[in-house]
Amino acid sequence: MNISKQEQRVLHTLAMGGEIRRYLNEDGKLTEITCFTREGYGLSNCTMDTFKKLKNKKLISSKGGRPYRITPLGATSAQAQMNQR
């Protein structure tokens, strides 16, 4: 599966315990997303476009209205990064 560098960064953050929170307007439409690391810091390169690509590829999912987390398919698709030794 082809995954861009930006998507890999987001997947790696999610694999390390991060989450993606979504914000809806009063009509129930998605207006904003924010990716958080496990320490609570925001990830700036997680855009709406990246979120939609990861969701369409079923690499992330949300259950019961909770924040989006990485799926088992996403965990196997994420490549290891050298800075996490």
Swiss-Prot record:
It comes from the Bacteria. Transmembrane segments: none annotated. Pfam families: YjhX_toxin. Belongs to the UPF0386 family. This is UPF0386 protein VF_0869.
